[in-house]
């Protein structure tokens, strides 16, 4: 995963408009996992790029391709925990993702949450 936005959309093939890879079957694996008996889709990633850039962002970079839609992701995992997304409201998805973001970026993500949802975090 290159980026995951606060709604759970996953960009894995581009950084903004710059293509860096192909889909590589990610969507097939995610949907296959969800469709299997007792299966769930799990996206695992480090919370940052080299400790400097958060992979959990308010919005995907302009021009980024959505590789996996928010409707196909059950869980996002970082070294800070697991964010359950399936069946959650948009507000709860955002809260769950902020909780597994790198601590250095959580305050900024909380500010974006408040702007988007017009309520205190």
Model-derived segments and spans:
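Conserved phosphate- and dinucleotide-binding cores of soluble alpha/beta proteins
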Residues: 1-121
